[in-house]
Amino acid sequence: MNNILHISSPNVYARFVGAPELHPLVSIIHYDEVSPIRTSLNNYGVYGLFIQKNFPRNLTYGMKMFDAADASIIAVEPGQIGGKEDSGEDIHISGWVLLFSPELLHGTDLEAKMKDYQYFSYFATETLKMNPSEWGRITQLLSQLRHELQENEDSPALRAVILGYIRLVLEYCQRIYQRQLSQEDKTSSDILKRYHNLLREYYLDGKQMDLGVPTVQYCAEQLAYSPR
């Protein structure tokens, strides 16, 4: 982990990938418009939403490694480490990234609200998976915000517009996150129900007389899950 890119401001990453610097506290990058880039293991001093269709494989996020699904979002916050060490190869990525400095939020109600967006946490073990409609809406918002940054000088009025767009994007992400949690809760409930039925049938059939207490291995095989 010697070659870590320290993203102390949004424009550090913009310079790294060769994208225009649009604002000192916000960066919006359309990966499709920049040359193929090198991967980097990043130490984040900013908030970020990586909204992509083809993430590099074996990404690091905290102490974990994972492969992101197609059309998904990875959210990062200051103090986190994530990405992938430079492999020496140029890769082409399709999608967008929104980076914004905590300084932009100082003194705003959004600053206090950030703790409610739990998808920024290392404990969020999955990326946010978008359907085509969500992909279209979120990327359209980023495109519109980028246009605002390109056409207007920094001012209190522009910062209010920036915060409005960012809040809307974050709320879309929150809705996706809550949907995934609901789906995961339903899946967990279904597994538990199947497990209880399995144990009930096991004892009703008298299998304990020949096989003893059902083992983790046995239950996993019957439920088609790994015992680990």
PLM features: residue spans?
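Short beta-strand His + acidic residue motifs that chelate non-heme Fe in jelly-roll/DSBH
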Residues: 58-60, 82-90
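A short, Lys/Arg-enriched amphipathic alpha-helix from helix-turn-helix/homeodomain DNA-binding modules
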Residues: 163, 185-225
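Conserved metal-binding segment of the jelly-roll/cupin
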Residues: 68-82, 99-102
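A hydrophobic/aromatic-rich effector-binding and dimerization subdomain
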Residues: 87-152
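Compact structured core domains
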Residues: 133-182
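Generic protein-terminus/edge-of-domain signal
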Residues: 1-68, 72
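Key DNA-contact positions within bacterial/archaeal DNA-binding proteins
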Residues: 228
